[in-house]
Amino acid sequence: MKASTGHWADEAAAKIVFEKGEKEQYTCASGITPSGTVHIGNFREIISVELVVRALRDMGKNVRFIYSWDDYDVFRKVPANMPKQDELEKHLRFPITMVPDPWERDANYARHHEVDVEKVLPKVGINPEFIYQAERYRSSRYAQGIRRALEKRDVLKNILDKFRDEEHKIQGEWQPVSVFCEKCNKDETEIDGWDGDWGLSYHCSACGCQEKLDMRKAKGVKLVWRIDWPMRWEYEKVDFEPAGKDHHSHGGSFDTARHVCKEVYDYDAPVSFRYDFIGTKGLPGKMSSSSGNVITIEDVLKVYTPEVARFLFAGTRPNTEFTISFDLDVIKIYEDYDKTERIAWKIETAKDETIFQKEKRIYELSQVSSDGKTPSLEGKQPPYQVPFRHLCNLIQIADGDIEKTLADLAAVDNGPNKEQLAVLRSRALCAKYWVENCAPDEFRFRLLPSGGAAALSQEERAKLRSLSDVEKNAVRILRDDVICKI
C-alpha cells in the first residue's frame, strides 16, 4: 500500500521507512501506566499505532507491534472511582504491581486494569505483543541500561537542564535512578552512592533500611521516567512511537528523551507524531456514574460496533481533537460510516478518484482483523445496510426483541443472508443499548396492543391533538416507512 491514498497512517508508514531505511523488521511501540481505569483517551494512542502498523504491513513490511505496561511505576494516588479507598491508600508509594486488587479478581491492582484492556482489544482487531515492565526490571534485564545512565549522569543532567529555567535546574548531587526499598517496598528512598561498577547504596526514610545493592541481581532499581523511556527505545529498537501533545510540547518528555536516546544510548529516537485529546458528550447517567466519568473502550463498544469505533479514529488525524458522542449524534456517525462503506464498495459514486481512494482506505482500516493485516474486499459481498435510525425504530416496534427484528429483516425480499445477519446483530445490539440507555426521551416509543387507542389517558389524547402538522407528518412517515413494511 502506497501513501498515495492520502491517509495519515500511510503517510506515517512511508515516513518511517524513509527515515529508518529498509529493515528486516520495524518495531512500533505504545504503552501506558495501569494506575487506574484505562480510558478512551488512552485508547487513541494504541489504535493510532495499530493503524500505522497495518499501513506498514500493507507495504509488505515485517512489523513487531509492542505494548508496554508500565506496571513498575509508583502508585502515587488513589483514583476517585476505585473501591476500597482506605485499603488502597495503605499502598501508596508501592510499585503498582504490589498493590492488591480491590475487586479481588486478579493478582494485583495493575494486573486488573491490564486484563480489562487485554480482553477488549481483540474485539477491535488489536493484538499487540504485551511487555510488562515490572517483570523486565525485577529480572534485571535493564541492568546494563541503568549502569549506562549512571556513567553518563553528567550528560543527562545537562540535557534535562537545557529545557529548564534557572529556578528549576537540578541542584546538588543527582542520580538518574530510584529504588523501591528491599524491606518495605516503598520508593521513599535516597541514593547514597554508586561504586562505579554494579553496586548502588541507598537508605529508606520510610522504614530506616540501609542497603547496598548489586544492580545485576536487585529487583527494586528503576530509571526515572525521562531516562527510562529512551533507554527502552534503544533496548527494543523502536522505530515508531507517538505521544500525547503534553509529551510533545517544547521541553516535554519527548524532547528530552530524543536527546538522551542519541547522546547516552547512541540510538536515533523513533519517528513520532502528536495525538490530541478526546472529548465525550451525551453520556447517560448510568455510564458516567459507574466509572467515575471515566469512559472506556468497553463503554464505547456498547454504542458503536467495533468497525464504527475504529472508523472514528481511522477517519480523524491523530493531531485533531474530536468528540465521541452518545447522544443523537450517534445516528449521524453511523450515517457517515454507511456512506463511506457504500463508496468503498462502489455502491455510491464518489465525487472524484481522490475522494474514492480516501474513503476506501478509511473503510479498509476500519475493518476488524485478527491477523494484524488490513482485510481485503476482494471476492467478498457488501454488508446489508440498515440505517441505525431505522434499526432503532424496528427494535422498538419489536419491543426490544433483537432476534425478532433480525428475523423480520431476513424475511423481506432480497433480505440479508446468514453472514450479513451476523454483522447486523452487532449493530442491533448497539441500537438496543443506545435506545434504552442513551437516546433522548422523545426518540423512544412503544406500540400499544390492538385496541390500545381506547386506553389513552385524557392527557395523552390532548398531546396527540396538540401535535403540529410537522409532527403529525412525522408520525405518518413512521407508520408508512417503518411499521407498514414489517
What are these regions (language model features)?
Residues 1-83, 230-251:
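N-terminal catalytic cores of NTP/NDP-binding nucleotidyl/phosphoryl-transfer enzymes
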Residues 72-89, 145-146, 285:
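Charged, often glycine-rich, active-site loop that binds/positions anionic groups
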Residues 249, 254, 276-443:
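Catalytic adenosine-cofactor/nucleotide-binding cores of aminoacyl-tRNA synthetases and other
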Residues 57, 122, 150-157, 161, ...:
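Hydrophobic/aromatic-lined pockets within catalytic cores
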